[in-house]
A protein has these predicted regions:
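Glycine-rich flavin
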Residues: 2-5, 21-28, 33-166, 199-203, ...
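Beta1/beta-strand and adjacent pyrophosphate-binding region of the FAD-binding site
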Residues: 2-13, 166-176
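Flexible, glycine-rich terminal cap/loop adjacent to redox cofactors
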Residues: 8-15, 21-36, 41, 48, ...
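Short hydrophobic core segments
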Residues: 8-10, 115, 130-140, 172-173, ...
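Glycine-rich dinucleotide-binding loop and its adjacent helix/turn
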Residues: 47, 139-192, 224-225, 273-275, ...
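A Rossmann-like FAD-binding core segment of flavoenzymes
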Residues: 109-112, 116-124, 189-289, 330, ...
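FAD-site-proximal beta/loop scaffold in flavoenzymes
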Residues: 152-168, 251-329
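A conserved FAD-binding loop/helix module that cradles the flavin
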Residues: 213, 301-361, 432-435, 440-451
Length: 451
């Protein structure tokens, strides 16, 4: 006989945990199904371990690039990759403990194992059947590996976090967040790093000002950027090294190859066909604005929904809003996917909210868009030989010059933009920005002093 719940969340990542906890807080009988470590991609092989590695890279840059001009004679005896990994994993372990504690306090039933649908109201885990009035699919995605000869000799972005030793020479293939971040970390920590992108630049969906500045810094400081580089074949040499051959005839010999070319939805292993839930050709689940699929009682949040934003806070927010609607009598609760702030932990970091210049002109008309920009050298680097640019932009629309896009790249931009996101969600105009007294000397003051 099947065990019945009010709510079953398939996937113990950020979205599933957030939704399960919120539903349980309102008295729902909830099951959370996860086969691996709680926290999903973000906590285990994504945002969290990546940010720890990035902090390590920042410390390396401080010592190697900037300390001397601040008067410090730093004698770096070496870098212990294994120690950083040990510290990183200990931190992740504490997050796992926190999840266990909070889920336990909320009386969420955590079921370990892989879930498969039996029908639209029933799932099977380890041979046991569970039913629910409401079922959330939040299984996330997996890294994609290209279909070329020798691709198996490389590792994916998840495998980067399994590296027990620091590689001496690395090729990172990809043009998105993950590729740029991994390449930046490895380069800063001392690995000879090559970043290969298919087109003319990485991060092509970002505002051109951001892209141009990032490429400028890469050209000056590294990692080595290879544009118009399409992988053709990977050959494993007799000495164990790998040679990446490109369609343009060029090649690069490295010790490690990391594929970071994107992700695909992990919907192929849950027997979704038994439910009738609609997906697109790539396996992404189709949902409406309330996270509902075409099958009553089945919902979806996170990286596997069609047209979604693949960011942890988005999945968390969407999962919580869904539980508010289902279990807290808030029929209109839903995720607002407009003006979502995002950061790339590159070198230097990038922050962006809203529309690029081109997107704003397409939406509002070129004559109704005004752009303000600022460029300077961050004070932190300005007193050193390794000066690094900082660029900022406001994209404004309409007679009132509502701020519809905010973009920045430079020292500490990652910590600047959260508050501006609040202002933009409230409909802030350029005049509102101008009315704020600047904090001096900071980089963030540029956002409220542009002319």
């Amino acid at each position: 006989m099947a065990t019945h719940f009010d709510y079953i969340c398939i996937g113990g990542g950020s979205g599933g945990i957030a939704s399960a906890n919120r539903a349980a807080m309102y008295g729902a009988k909830v099951a959370l199904i996860e086969a691996q470590d709680l926290g999903g991609t973000c906590v285990n092989v994504g945002c969290v371990p990546k940010k720890v590695m990035w902090h390590g890279a920042q410390i390396a840059e401080a010592m190697n690039l900037y300390a001397e001009d601040y008067g410090f004679d730093v004698d770096v005896k070496g870098f212990d990759w294994s120690k950083l990994v040990e510290s990183r994993q200990a931190y992740i372990g504490r997050i796992h403990q926190s999840y266990d504690r909070v889920l336990g306090n909320n009386k969420v039933n955590v079921i370990k194992g892989f879930a498969k649908f039996v029908d639209e109201k029933t799932v099977e885990v380890n041979g046991e059947h569970y039913t629910a009035d409401h079922i959330l699919i939040a299984v996330g995605g997996r890294p994609t590996i290209p279909n070329i000869p020798g691709a198996e000799y490389g590792i994916d972005s998840n495998g980067f976090f399994d590296l027990a030793e620091q590689p001496k020479r690395v090729a990172v293939v990809g043009a998105g967040y993950i590729a740029v971040e991994i390449a930046g970390v490895l380069h800063a920590l001392g690995t000879e790093t090559h970043l290969f992108v298919r087109k003319e630049s990485p991060l092509r969906s970002f505002d051109p000002m951001i892209i141009d500045t990032l490429v400028e810094v890469m050209d000056a400081e590294g990692p080595t950027l290879h544009t118009h580089s399409v992988p053709k074949e990977v050959v494993k040499e007799a000495d164990g090294s790998l040679t990446l051959h490109l369609e343009n005839g060029e090649s690069q010999n490295v010790d490690q190859l990391i594929w970071a070319i994107g992700r695909h939805p992990a919907t192929d292993a849950i027997n979704l066909a038994s439910t009738g839930v609609a997906t697109n050709k790539k396996g992404y689940i189709k949902v409406d604005e309330y996270q509902e699929t075409n099958v009553k009682g089945i919902y979806c949040v996170g990286d596997i929904m069609e047209g979604g934003i693949e960011l942890t806070p988005v999945a968390v927010k969407a999962g919580r809003q869904l539980s508010e609607r289902l279990f807290n009598n808030k029929p209109n609760a839903k995720m607002d996917y407009d003006l979502v702030p995002t950061v790339v932990f590159s070198h230097p970091p990038i922050g962006t909210i809203g529309l690029t210049t081109q997107e704003a002109e397409e939406k509002y008309g070129k004559d109704n868009v005004k752009v303000y920009t600022s460029g300077f050298t961050a004070m932190y680097t300005a007193v050193t030989k390794h000066r690094q640019p900082c660029k900022m932009k406001l994209v404004c629309a309409g007679e009132e010059e509502t701020v519809v896009g905010l973009h920045g790249i430079g020292f500490t931009v990652d910590e600047m933009i959260q508050g501006f996101g609040v202002a933009m969600k409230m409909g802030a105009t350029k005049a509102d920005f101008d009315s704020v007294v600047a904090i001096h000397p900071t980089g963030s003051e540029e956002f409220v002093t542009m002319r």
